[in-house]
Amino acid sequence: MATTSRRFTTGLFASITSVKSHSANRPQSISLIRRNHIDHRLPLIVPSSRRWIIQAARSWDGFDDGAEAEIKKPGAYGYAIGDNEIEGSSSSTVHVIDGEHVKTAEIVIWAAVTAAFGVGNRVMYKLALVPLKEYPFFLAQLSTFGYVAVYYTILYFRYRAGTVTDAMLSVPKSPFLIVGILEALAAAAGMAAAANLSGPSTTVLSQTFLVWQIFFSIIFLGRRYSVNQILGCTLVALGVIVSVASGSGAAHSLNEAGVLWILLMVLSFLLQGAGTVLKEVIFIDSQRRLKGASLDLFIVNSYGSAFQAICIALLLPFLSKLWGIPFNQLGTYLKDGAVCFLNNGTITKGCDGAPFLPLLFVIMNIGYNIALLRLLKISSAVVSCLASTVSVPIAVFLFTMPLPYLGVASSLPKGFMGGTIILVLGMILYSWTPHGANSSHTDSVIPSPPPT
């Protein structure tokens, strides 16, 4: 009667060996032992002829402790699922739980960082438009084309430092092309619709972004969301609508706006949602291609931004027309915008605050995009969207304060406090895990028996 064993070591390398006569010191690796006979030395006899035992063990160091090495040490645990008996060390469970807690803490930290950058991004964009109020299209193109140079510069230094590897750079580029096309089309559709919709109406319609992300996560990632998560997302979106658009005539504005512009704005957020979920798919797929290694987020930022810039360049005749700039005058417009941005030259009247305020916006926007993509990488597209959504009412509140260059502060919307409470309740409900919801989680982490 031969006994075969497959050993998966949890150290820096994995080894698969056949063990016939020795019993190793096992407390830190996983040994999957297939028994084709009934071992009378075991205190428990099961009539099944095929059993898999999963046992926490230390890598074998060549010393044999004898037959007694099979006896469970204090602190070990065992249980069975069907015909499968599972044995392991309680310390292994502690490490898994600690790892989950560390990841949860990291997600919370990056969610807070993303929300903070989101607030700063919204505030600094409004401040940047003070000196560039005549050149908003220039600022938009600076954000599109200037960031490509910034991201590739960062990527170059990370490659030189060894953080980015050749294997990472060799991943397929077609997904990045699709991301660039989606984001460029989303920008074009959003600009066209925003020109015919009021600000509060756009805020209401922007909440469909979260809906599309949930939809695409279910379709392309196979995710399943619990009732409390769906309800939590709904409350977050409702809270933003109530806190920002209440009392502003948003409903009346939507009734007056044409159906075409409403559908075009919804299409814009659909394309953005698809692009965001596709980035998550890229991160997940890269782990398989890189054999468990994590794809550097600056690769996604760099290639995605480059393809988006190419698509935007092709759409410039259409986009300039949306901004009321004849295409034959676009070159002069961009040149004058650059002079105002630098605040150096003949066109400096009304450019007070440049280049300081626009540069602050550029820095804040880059930080926001990096934090948003980092949060998406370690969590999901939906979580990153929720963190970004929280920044909306906070920014609205900050605009009620006497900020420099903005003049008279705005007043809070009538339903701001009520909407904020709804939003917070939605966030709590989304993150709440009902008791016993993870009871089946253990089954999903038990490795399947190797083929026979």
From Swiss-Prot:
Q: What happens when the gene is disrupted?
A: No visible phenotype. Clt1, clt3 and clt3 triple mutants are more sensitive to Cd(2+), have a decreased level of cytosolic GSH, an altered systemic acquired resistance response and are more sensitive to Phytophthora infection. Clt1, clt3 and clt3 triple mutants have decreased lateral root densities.
- Which Pfam families does the record cross-reference, listed alphabetically? CRT-like (PF08627)
Q: Which GO terms describe its biological process?
A: defense response to oomycetes; glutathione transport; response to cadmium ion
Checking InterPro entries in the record gives:
CRT-like
What are the entry keywords? Chloroplast, Membrane, Plastid, Transit peptide, Transmembrane, Transmembrane helix, Transport
Instruction: Give the GO cellular component terms, alphabetically.
Output: chloroplast membrane; plastid
Domain of life according to the entry = Eukaryota
Transmembrane domains' residue ranges: 105-125, 137-157, 175-195, 202-222, 230-250, 258-278, 307-327, 353-373, 389-409, 412-432
State the compartments where it is located.
Plastid, Chloroplast membrane
Topology in membrane: Multi-pass membrane protein
The UniProt similarity line reads: Belongs to the CRT-like transporter family.
Functional description taken from the UniProt entry = Involved in thiol transport from the plastid to the cytosol. Transports probably both glutathione (GSH) and its precursor, gamma-glutamylcysteine (gamma-EC). Exhibits some functional redundancy with CLT1 in maintaining the root GSH pool.
Question: Which PANTHER family does the annotation name?
Answer: PROTEIN CLT2, CHLOROPLASTIC (PTHR31326), PROTEIN CLT3, CHLOROPLASTIC (PTHR31326:SF3)
List the protein's name. Answer: Protein CLT3, chloroplastic
Q: Which organism is it from?
A: Arabidopsis thaliana
